[in-house]
Amino acid sequence: MPQLDTSTWFITITSMIMTLFILFQLKISNYSYPASPESIELKTQKHSTPWEMKWTKIYLPLLLPPR
Protein backbone atom coordinates (compact mmCIF):
# COMPACT_ATOMS: atom_id res chain seq x y z
CA MET A 1 0.00 0.00 0.00
CA PRO A 2 1.57 3.35 -1.02
CA GLN A 3 2.27 5.94 1.60
CA LEU A 4 0.21 9.14 1.55
CA ASP A 5 2.24 12.11 0.36
CA THR A 6 1.55 15.01 2.73
CA SER A 7 4.34 17.31 1.57
CA THR A 8 1.97 19.69 -0.23
CA TRP A 9 -0.65 19.88 2.51
CA PHE A 10 0.94 22.79 4.34
CA ILE A 11 1.05 25.10 1.32
CA THR A 12 -2.44 24.03 0.26
CA ILE A 13 -4.00 24.70 3.65
CA THR A 14 -2.07 27.95 4.09
CA SER A 15 -3.11 29.28 0.70
CA MET A 16 -6.73 28.26 1.33
CA ILE A 17 -6.80 30.12 4.66
CA MET A 18 -5.22 33.20 3.12
CA THR A 19 -7.68 33.15 0.23
CA LEU A 20 -10.66 32.84 2.56
CA PHE A 21 -9.33 35.68 4.71
CA ILE A 22 -8.92 37.95 1.68
CA LEU A 23 -12.37 37.07 0.35
CA PHE A 24 -14.01 37.80 3.70
CA GLN A 25 -12.13 41.08 3.99
CA LEU A 26 -13.33 42.13 0.55
CA LYS A 27 -16.87 41.08 1.39
CA ILE A 28 -16.91 43.01 4.67
CA SER A 29 -15.30 46.11 3.15
CA ASN A 30 -18.30 46.57 0.82
CA TYR A 31 -20.67 47.25 3.73
CA SER A 32 -21.32 50.86 4.67
CA TYR A 33 -21.67 51.49 8.37
CA PRO A 34 -23.25 54.65 9.84
CA ALA A 35 -20.80 57.11 11.38
CA SER A 36 -22.53 57.37 14.75
CA PRO A 37 -25.38 54.94 15.45
CA GLU A 38 -26.39 56.86 18.60
CA SER A 39 -27.49 59.92 16.61
CA ILE A 40 -30.09 58.05 14.55
CA GLU A 41 -33.54 58.23 16.10
CA LEU A 42 -35.84 55.34 15.44
CA LYS A 43 -39.47 56.19 14.79
CA THR A 44 -41.82 53.95 16.68
CA GLN A 45 -45.10 53.11 15.05
CA LYS A 46 -48.22 52.64 17.10
CA HIS A 47 -50.00 49.49 16.12
CA SER A 48 -53.74 49.68 16.48
CA THR A 49 -55.24 46.59 18.01
CA PRO A 50 -58.96 45.92 18.37
CA TRP A 51 -58.86 45.79 22.16
CA GLU A 52 -57.42 49.31 22.41
CA MET A 53 -60.62 50.75 20.91
CA LYS A 54 -62.87 49.29 23.58
CA TRP A 55 -63.12 50.12 27.24
CA THR A 56 -62.86 47.02 29.31
CA LYS A 57 -63.00 46.56 33.03
CA ILE A 58 -61.43 43.55 34.62
CA TYR A 59 -63.19 42.25 37.70
CA LEU A 60 -61.11 40.37 40.16
CA PRO A 61 -63.60 38.70 42.48
CA LEU A 62 -60.96 37.37 44.84
CA LEU A 63 -59.63 40.86 45.52
CA LEU A 64 -63.01 42.50 46.13
CA PRO A 65 -63.83 43.27 49.77
CA PRO A 66 -66.49 41.01 51.32
CA ARG A 67 -70.03 42.42 51.51
Swiss-Prot record:
GO terms for cellular component: mitochondrial membrane; proton-transporting ATP synthase complex. GO terms for molecular function: proton transmembrane transporter activity. The keyword Transmembrane helix applies. It is a single-pass membrane protein. The modification N6-acetyllysine is found at K54, K57. It comes from the Eukaryota. It is found in: Mitochondrion membrane. The modification N6-succinyllysine is found at K54. Its main location: mitochondrion. The chain crosses the membrane at residues 8-24. GO terms for biological process: proton motive force-driven ATP synthesis. It holds the Pfam family ATP-synt_8. Keywords: Acetylation, ATP synthesis, CF(0), Hydrogen ion transport, Ion transport, Membrane, Mitochondrion, Transmembrane, Transmembrane helix, Transport. Subunit 8, of the mitochondrial membrane ATP synthase complex (F(1)F(0) ATP synthase or Complex V) that produces ATP from ADP in the presence of a proton gradient across the membrane which is generated by electron transport complexes of the respiratory chain. ATP synthase complex consist of a soluble F(1) head domain - the catalytic core - and a membrane F(1) domain - the membrane proton channel. These two domains are linked by a central stalk rotating inside the F(1) region and a stationary peripheral stalk. Component of the ATP synthase complex composed at least of ATP5F1A/subunit alpha, ATP5F1B/subunit beta, ATP5MC1/subunit c (homooctomer), MT-ATP6/subunit a, MT-ATP8/subunit 8, ATP5ME/subunit e, ATP5MF/subunit f, ATP5MG/subunit g, ATP5MK/subunit k, ATP5MJ/subunit j, ATP5F1C/subunit gamma, ATP5F1D/subunit delta, ATP5F1E/subunit epsilon, ATP5PF/subunit F6, ATP5PB/subunit b, ATP5PD/subunit d, ATP5PO/subunit OSCP. Belongs to the ATPase protein 8 family. This is ATP synthase F(0) complex subunit 8. It comes from Sus scrofa.
